[in-house]
Amino acid sequence: MKKYILIGLGGAIGAILRCFIRNTKIPVYKGEFPISTLMINLSGAFILAVILITANEIWSFNEEIRLGIATGFVGAYTTFSTMCKETIILMNKNLYFLAFCYVTVSVVFGLLFAYFGALSARKILSRLLKVRKEDEKAS
């Protein structure tokens, strides 16, 4: 039961944050490209990789907490269905090349952001563990 509560809480926070970012206007951008959804999904790929690397390889997160963050927060924060809807909207406006670019950039850069999220987590956390070991030796 606890894991469902944590997933729900994480989901509520992720959905609220996504809505906030989605409704934030980027003053220098006025085009058709759905930049806010792209930013949300790319940052979500990065965040999910960091969380999973941290939970699985560095610290042993409680499974319920990991699910609350990964499934709840990141699952509600990112939005594949909105990306699909926005792609269809671009296609309905005969903006086929822009739709193609949107899907391509979303997938390719999503994978890159996930890769760099995993890389960043490993690098930062290995440094933290090294500092912790040095502190323990010094004491």
UniProtKB/Swiss-Prot annotation:
Pfam families: CRCB
UniProt keyword Signal, yes or no: no
Gene Ontology annotations for the cellular component aspect, listed alphabetically: plasma membrane
Keyword Cell membrane attributed: yes
Keywords (A to Z) from UniProt: Cell membrane, Ion channel, Ion transport, Membrane, Metal-binding, Sodium, Transmembrane, Transmembrane helix, Transport
Subcellular location: Cell membrane
Gene Ontology BP term (one): cellular detoxification of fluoride
Transmembrane segments: 1-21, 33-53, 65-84, 97-117
Gene Ontology molecular-function annotations: fluoride channel activity; metal ion binding
Regulation affecting activity: Na(+) is not transported, but it plays an essential structural role and its presence is essential for fluoride channel function.
This protein's name: Fluoride-specific ion channel FluC 1
Organism in which the protein naturally occurs: Clostridium acetobutylicum (strain ATCC 824 / DSM 792 / JCM 1419 / IAM 19013 / LMG 5710 / NBRC 13948 / NRRL B-527 / VKM B-1787 / 2291 / W)
Upper lineage: Bacteria, Bacillati, Bacillota, Clostridia, Eubacteriales
